[in-house]
Amino acid sequence: MEKSVLRKEMKLLRKSMDKNDRTAKDKKIFENLIKLDSFKSSSWFYVYVSYGTEADTKNLIEYLFELKKEREIHVAVPKVLGDEMEFFEINLFSELEKGCMGILEPSTGNKVKPENAFMVLPGLAFDEEHKRLGYGGGFYDKYLSKCGAERFMKVAVCYDFQMQKKGVIASDSNDIKVDMIVTDKAYY
């Protein structure tokens, strides 16, 4: 399937979700994510700030802020700078402001150097081979290529209907696969 067609289809499906259904699925994704051993053992978390109909990460970020009271962890979120993306450490939601395309980004803060980290990635579609179809800007692929994808436990979160059969998502040589996909129903 053509990437543009699949992107459009996934956006429409996410947009058509019932609010209560979305809330229940977001809760299940969160619960599934925090059960992971790799999550429990991490001290650095690179997390996208959900926007629009994306699987929610704001509750996850709030949870991480609470977790900071119990153990030393660091939370970093992305900021688009031109045609690239960098991650900045944050300690409070109030450190975010609307940035590129209206997405919440750090207003200030310390740009982080790539650490061995647990990274939560967004996307429109994924498959059983761990291919990821993003929004087309290549921000995550460029960042991971530049920093070394092996430094991160790359975990995508999505609704189960965003999972595709093997071979549906075309990939280019610069596309970086995720290590795991967590949905409201399963782990892939």
Question: Regions from the language model: what does each represent?
Answer:
Residues 1-112:
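N-terminal active-site beta-alpha-beta segment that forms phosphate/nucleotide-binding
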Residues 84, 121-123, 136:
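A short beta-strand-loop-alpha-helix capping motif that often carries His-Thr
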Residues 100, 132-136:
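Short glycine/serine/threonine-biased micro-segments
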